[in-house]
């Protein structure tokens, strides 16, 4: 064994061995418990950052720990490789997106290997590889056949800078999640997935995921947004059709005084009279420049315009003016809102602004509302008034009775509505998965026959930065023949949202080389579900929801038998420096390469795991990195100095140990239990590492030289330190394990066994209080009775002096912890 710890030499040695031996290759093993550990795969941006280091270090600890516990571990890695940054880089560097992407993958793969992460690299996949995306095209065709994929014209979120459509989930505070440009509204024909068909199941199954953070589940439940209410028809004056409204507040129907339509509502222009057309068109132009999320914000100014038309309240026969309102969306309900200004705050503000009539229909119990003096809407329960036969009822009771009344009279029906909208997947970008559809003037939209897949992304695209989709300019790609009639036809030039690729990659990892379809059912049945998934909470209502949806779709298509993809979910915190998230723009980035070069990968791993619990943000500290490096050097020195003494020692005889030996062994086994629990049950790696550090301190203070019978426990302690450190600092631990004379690698070694008998305390340290104030500590035998302990406390010299001459009223003993003497 070398006297000095040289990280570069140690890490290069073990990385080569792991690579050549395929040490982490996962195979299906019947009869062995499997464990599928997965971190969200990265976009190949060019370099890994400290967020990657932390995320993947967390996962690697769990993977290595589970291997040592005897599990058959699957721990794969791949690349979420399609996406707009590759096109932007192509323009900037005058390089093809494929070249840029694959060069980045090669570099980042090397970085990950230098970190010592225990991936099965034989399962590596890149979503931009045709061998991956061709199966996604087949899944699309099967979804199309089942009616789960469709195309229609709709109002979409449009990023003018990226020149592509964004899903609602990709709009953050009115801006594009990728480039921060203000999002606009645009009418486009686009492909969508019918995720709403699975809304009920997606919602119900959130209650079957006890291993997920409640915060994520709540975010998904709110996004799905199930609400029960009524669908009511309001006839339109002078027309035979009606406006359908969904409401959860049918108890306020008698107070509806006007109708608010979404500007995008199909009846918006039809209901606009000639004298109102100019002002309505101006209003519509203004709304198109405002994104939908901003329009629904509470503090957003409510604006509208009168169409000139009226509808009829079905229960009061009131003539209700029809307005277009900027806060109403077609994305929720029917795109029409029966406005009840006295009992809805948005309607109240709107009615006050445009001088629209109001009617109170719910009074607070024991109170009275007057429209003339109201300063805000009354939205709580109360007593029904001005509501015909329902007057005097509690509004909650009336809500149910009015729903029944509407159904009986044929005026409406009870229904369930979801906030969740179908997932628009069309993107006007080149670097994505081509949608396998052909357009024929005679036959319409025709699916590409499965035998003709894949539709390969052409490599001869030109990237000028002038905007638009490069695919739409490649005649050799666009021009084709109709599969049905053989006439000239053209290909779809939209590509799929990159969230489609990340919605099933975890399944493909189970069978990355399967050539007969998207999934090998036997292998997916063995490995799925993912036992532990790790990634950021920012994916709660995008990737994590889409992945759940896709898993259910693939189940229904017969590819797998699971309902949920991820049994347990850990959402790790960010890495921050100088009070904010690391970013190039803020100049607070720490380069992992520089860190590895100076300290080694194991120090980088150790610090990222020790500095904070995984679910919390990690505050970067250069001093903390130095401290982690010093600790590893201390352990190295300890093993080096102990090696001559322990290398030839015999088996451990617990009965022969001195008191000092028993004390050390007790600490060893308490530490084994704590580290095991902290990794397995809590993922509190920071407290696990702290416990190992305390154990190292105890070993350093241990002096066995004059007591040969204690040498075996020193060996047990030193080997336990190495084994316990193995998941955290694997290169370091492998080198020490080999130096200790072991021929097996640590990924083949067993986790140290906990000996409960060895961990039992022979003595207890009892805290002593007098009238609740700390006055001392007393050591007693662990086997002492309650009365023995009380007697020992009263016999203690210091305590005896404190209570001398006082009247002892009672003695309270908290078993194993403290004695409180109450005196008067």
UniProtKB/Swiss-Prot annotation:
It is found in: Cytoplasm. InterPro entries: aa-tRNA-synth_I_CS, aa-tRNA-synth_Ia, Leu-tRNA-ligase, Leu_tRNA-synth_edit, M/V/L/I-tRNA-synth_anticd-bd, Methionyl/Leucyl_tRNA_Synth, Rossmann-like_a/b/a_fold, tRNAsynth_Ia_anticodon-bd. This is Leucine--tRNA ligase. GO terms for molecular function: aminoacyl-tRNA deacylase activity; ATP binding; leucine-tRNA ligase activity. One of its GO terms (biological process) is leucyl-tRNA aminoacylation. Its EC number is 6.1.1.4. A motif ('HIGH' region) lies at residues 42-52. A motif ('KMSKS' region) lies at residues 581-585. Belongs to the class-I aminoacyl-tRNA synthetase family. It comes from Geotalea daltonii (strain DSM 22248 / JCM 15807 / FRC-32) (Geobacter daltonii). It catalyses: tRNA(Leu) + L-leucine + ATP = L-leucyl-tRNA(Leu) + AMP + diphosphate. The keyword Nucleotide-binding applies. ATP binds at residue 584. Pfam families: Anticodon_1, tRNA-synt_1, tRNA-synt_1_2, tRNA-synt_1g. GO terms for cellular component: cytosol. The keyword Amino-acid biosynthesis does not apply.
């Amino acid at each position: 064994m070398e006297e000095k710890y040289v990280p570069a030499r140690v890490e290069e040695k073990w990385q080569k061995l792991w690579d050549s031996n395929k040490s982490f290759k996962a195979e299906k093993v019947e009869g062995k418990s499997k464990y599928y550990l997965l971190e969200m795969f990265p976009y190949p941006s060019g370099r890994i950052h400290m967020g990657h280091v932390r995320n993947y270090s967390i996962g690697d600890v769990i993977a290595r720990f589970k291997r040592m516990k005897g599990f058959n571990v699957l721990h794969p890695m791949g690349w979420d490789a399609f996406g707009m940054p590759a096109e932007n880089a192509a323009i900037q560097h005058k390089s093809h997106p494929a070249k840029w992407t694959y060069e980045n993958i090669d570099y980042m793969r090397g970085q990950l290997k230098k970190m010592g992460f225990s991936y099965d690299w034989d399962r590596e996949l890149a979503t931009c590889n045709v061998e991956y995306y061709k199966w996604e095209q087949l899944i699309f065709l099967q979804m199309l056949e089942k009616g789960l994929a469709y195309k229609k014209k709709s109002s979409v979120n449009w990023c003018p800078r990226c020149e592509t459509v964004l899903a609602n989930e990709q709009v953050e505070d009115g801006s594009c999640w990728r480039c921060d440009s203000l999002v606009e509204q645009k009418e486009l024909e686009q492909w969508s997935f019918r995720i709403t068909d699975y809304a009920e199941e997606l919602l119900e199954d959130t209650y079957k995921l006890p291993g997920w953070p409640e915060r994520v589940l709540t975010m998904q439940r709110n996004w799905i947004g199930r609400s029960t209410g009524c669908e009511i028809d309001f006839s339109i004056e002078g027309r035979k059709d009606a406006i359908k409204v969904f409401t959860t507040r049918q108890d306020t129907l008698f107070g509806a005084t006007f109708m608010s339509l979404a500007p995008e509502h199909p009846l918006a222009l039809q209901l606009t009279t000639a004298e109102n057309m100019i002002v309505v068109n101006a209003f519509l132009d203004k709304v198109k420049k405002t994104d939908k999320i901003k329009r629904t914000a509470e503090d957003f100014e409510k604006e509208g315009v009168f169409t000139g038309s009226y509808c009829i309240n079905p229960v009061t026969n009131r003539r209700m003016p029809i307005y277009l309102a900027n806060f109403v969306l077609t994305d929720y309900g029917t795109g029409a809102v029966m406005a009840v200004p006295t009992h809805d705050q948005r309607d109240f503000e709107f009615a006050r602004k445009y001088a629209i009539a109001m009617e109170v229909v719910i009074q607070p119990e024991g109170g009275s509302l007057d429209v003339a003096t109201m300063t805000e809407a009354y939205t709580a329960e109360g007593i029904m008034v001005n509501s015909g036969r329902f007057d005097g009822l509690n509004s909650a009771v009336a809500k149910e009775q009015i729903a029944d009344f509407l159904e009986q009279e044929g005026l409406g029906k009870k229904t369930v509505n979801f906030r969740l909208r179908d997932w628009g997947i069309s993107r006007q970008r080149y670097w994505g998965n081509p949608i396998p559809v052909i357009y024929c003037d005679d036959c319409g939209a025709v699916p590409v026959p499965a035998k003709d897949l894949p539709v390969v992304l052409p490599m001869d695209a030109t990237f000028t930065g002038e905007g638009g989709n490069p695919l739409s300019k490649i005649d050799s790609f666009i021009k084709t023949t109709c599969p049905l009639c053989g006439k000239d036809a053209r290909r779809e030039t939209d590509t799929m949202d990159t969230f489609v690729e990340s919605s099933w990659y975890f399944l493909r990892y189970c069978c990355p080389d399967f050539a007969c379809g998207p999934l090998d059912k036997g292998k997916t049945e063995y490995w799925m579900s993912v036992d532990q998934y790790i990634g950021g909470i920012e994916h709660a209502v995008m990737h994590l929801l889409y992945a759940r949806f896709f898993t259910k779709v693939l189940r229904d298509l017969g590819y797998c038998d699971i309902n949920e993809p991820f049994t347990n979910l850990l959402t790790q915190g960010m890495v921050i420096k100088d009070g904010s998230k690391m970013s190039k723009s803020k100049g607070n980035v720490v380069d992992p390469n520089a860190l590895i070069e100076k300290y080694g990968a194991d120090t980088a791993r150790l610090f990222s795991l020790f500095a904070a619990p995984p679910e919390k943000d990690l505050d970067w500290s250069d001093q903390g990195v130095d401290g982690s490096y010093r600790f590893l050097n201390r352990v190295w020195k300890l093993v080096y100095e102990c090696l001559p003494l322990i290398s030839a020692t015999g088996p451990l005889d617990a009965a022969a140990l001195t008191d000092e030996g028993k004390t050390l062994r007790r600490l060893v086994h308490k530490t084994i239990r704590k580290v095991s629990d902290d990794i397995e049950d809590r993922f509190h790696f920071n407290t696990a590492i702290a416990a190992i550090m305390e154990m190292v301190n105890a070993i350093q203070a241990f002096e066995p030289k004059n007591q040969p019978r204690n040498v075996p426990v020193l060996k047990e302690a030193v080997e336990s330190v190495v084994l316990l450190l193995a998941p955290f600092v694997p290169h370091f631990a492998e080198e020490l394990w080999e130096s200790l004379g072991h021929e097996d690698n640590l990924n083949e070694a067993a986790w140290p066994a906990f000996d409960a008998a060895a961990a039992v305390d022979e003595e207890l340290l009892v805290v002593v209080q007098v009238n609740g104030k700390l006055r001392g500590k007393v050591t007693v035998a662990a086997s002492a009775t309650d009365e023995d302990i009380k007697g020992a406390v009263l016999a203690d010299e210091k305590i005896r002096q404190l209570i001398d001459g006082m009247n002892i009223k009672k003695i309270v003993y908290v078993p194993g912890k403290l004695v409180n003497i109450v005196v008067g």
